[in-house]
Amino acid sequence: MKSCGAPLDILIKGGKLLTLSPGKEIWDNPLIGIRDGRIIFIEEAHAPLVSLYNPTETIDASGCLVLPGLVNTHTHVPMVCFRGLADDLPLMEWLEDHIFPVERKYICRETVRAGALLGIAEMILSGTTTFCDGYFYESTIAGAAREAGIRCVAGMGIFDADIGKVTPKEIVGHVRAAEKFLGKWADGGSMLIPALFCHAPYTCSPETIRAVKETARRHGAPFLIHVAETATEKDIIMKLYGNGP
């Protein structure tokens, strides 16, 4: 008998396939053919025909669940470098007494790249194929994602120096930087989607948030923000503006 076309790079056989189709069908003992990094077919198993696919590698998934890649919808991926630094603390204490000080001291393009590559490797190892990120030096993170071949929504991080003293010049600077970032990664296709990330209502003024949100809307880009995370945040925003977040 002849083989079935060009050889496969990988053939996955056995196990149970969770399709995530509208009916959430589960297939028993499927055959999944992969060539050049793409799934080219999914079929019901026919054991006598497996050899016809001539795969370079065969993965026996017996006893396993085969499913589409996981999606991590909220990351600041280089912060893997701060793992274990300060755990189980109230948010504002964690940020102001621990995270913000070490970010000011250690965060640069080199540490962001190292942390991004480590965090991405851990995500891939655990089955995550897409993540949505927001941080400093986001172009460095986007480049690391492209290098690793993982799908990324990359949000350029925006903070005000002092939300009580934001000037029109500072807001114009935010918008120009945002437009430059979106333009740089506009050709990312489905694997790299540029976004804008205002950190939070307690680190970005309403004027900054509105201007950045409008920039995202104008470019058709996602807009990301932390909001209403804790009761303390509600108290902070109520004190500042007389309204909840």
Region spans (language model):
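N-terminal metal-binding scaffold of metallo-dependent hydrolase/deaminase domains
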Residues: 1-52
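Divalent metal-coordination and catalytic microenvironments
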Residues: 15, 32, 37, 63, ...
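Short, glycine/acidic-enriched loop or turn micro-motifs at the edges of active sites
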Residues: 75-77, 136, 229
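Alpha-helical scaffold segments that flank or form the walls of functional sites
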Residues: 83-150, 174-188
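Metal-coordinating catalytic core of metallo-dependent amide/deamination hydrolases
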Residues: 141-245
